[in-house]
A protein has these predicted regions:
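A residue-level marker of the well-folded mature domains of exported/periplasmic proteins
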Residues: 1-171
């Protein structure tokens, strides 16, 4: 309504909302990150999806994790069980097992992308089960997983931004 030519939304959970707004302003163009426009309700013609190969980034994290693990157990903390998060985790587990077939991979979801204490608790549980590498795919919440890893002197791997400021055990 304000006359913008292009609007960009970010996040799988914004898909249906973006499609609904796009229908109301058909002269504006929309792009949404982490969503295939073909899967949107009503398939509005003024919306394009921007997809990434999350599994490939996850694969690199899996190779790094399997390489540095001394216990033979690595883990991942997802925010929610949604396609982009699951793609990161699938790549992580697949490539870790390709490199070291006997490696144990643990995974759990915090059900949150914001509350750091939830991801910290999930990560601490995984560390308690022997994980010495924690891969977080949980947005702001995941910083809690990285903090848990740093406080426990195990490796932490993050996504989306540089998280090295959280400790020296970051990959």
């Amino acid at each position: 309504k304000q006359g913008y030519d292009m609007i960009i939304a970010v996040g799988f959970l914004m898909g249906d909302s973006t499609a609904a707004v796009a229908k109301k302003v058909p002269k504006s163009k929309f792009a949404i990150v982490d969503v295939s426009a073909a899967g949107l309700k009503g398939k509005p013609k003024n919306v394009r999806g921007i997809m990434f190969a999350e599994q490939e980034a996850g694969c690199l994290a899996g190779i790094a994790g399997a390489t540095v693990s001394k216990t033979g157990t690595i883990s991942s903390v997802g925010g929610l069980k949604i396609p982009p998060v699951d793609a990161f985790i699938a790549g992580y587990q697949f490539c870790a097992k390709k490199l070291k077939p006997a490696i144990i991979t643990l995974n759990a979801y915090s059900q949150d992308f914001v509350a750091q204490d939830k991801c910290q608790e999930v990560a601490l549980n995984q560390i308690g089960e022997g994980s010495d590498v924690v891969f977080q795919v949980a947005g702001q919440c995941g910083l809690g997983a990285i903090t848990a890893a740093a406080d426990s002197s195990v490796w932490g791997i993050g996504v989306d931004s540089d998280q090295a400021f959280l400790g020296t055990q970051g990959l």
